[in-house]
């Protein structure tokens, strides 16, 4: 008789709060570092490992995909494969993406790297890409691997590049 234990979100939040690092880095660790895995995936797929601006959109899509898949895997009793669980995971990934964009946009404006308008419009593009990735992550397997690369490569050409600069 194996006892099924429900995950305790309060224990997880307490663990995140008490560990070193930013809230974002702590959450990333708990989710299996989806951005780090996405960056590795993208570097291997584009430009022979060199980082370029054209990789921003696929990085956002793939990071959101992996975040959604990780959240699906965290749901108890196999709920991550239910319609409700897939939707909750995609919603959660978009909330986390929006929090990241708010932080990144604020930081960029504060440091003088971009105007409020540029930061806002770039965030909108990134959130569009995050949404697409969360949809990809909500369907099919939840392996956090490169099995969905072909799907992402097909949709990426219809998405914004994720970089915005006002014309001077």
Predicted regions and their residues:
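Bulky hydrophobic segments
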Residues: 6-121, 128-131, 135-168
């Amino acid at each position: 008789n194996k006892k099924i234990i429900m995950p305790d979100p309060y224990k997880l939040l307490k663990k995140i709060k008490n560990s070193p690092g930013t809230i974002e880095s702590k959450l990333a660790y708990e989710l299996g570092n989806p951005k780090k895995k996405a960056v590795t995936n993208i570097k291997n797929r584009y430009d022979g490992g060199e980082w370029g601006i054209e990789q921003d959109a696929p990085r956002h899509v793939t990071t959101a995909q992996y975040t959604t898949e990780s959240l699906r895997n965290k749901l108890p009793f196999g709920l991550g494969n239910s319609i409700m669980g897939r939707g909750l995971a995609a919603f959660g990934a978009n909330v986390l993406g929006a929090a990241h964009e708010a932080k990144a946009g604020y930081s960029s404006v504060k440091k003088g790297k971009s105007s409020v308008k540029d930061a806002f419009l770039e965030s909108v593009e990134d959130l569009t890409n995050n949404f697409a990735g969360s949809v990809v992550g909500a369907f099919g397997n939840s392996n956090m691997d490169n099995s969905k690369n072909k799907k992402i490569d097909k949709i990426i050409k219809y998405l914004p590049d994720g970089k915005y600069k006002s014309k001077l």
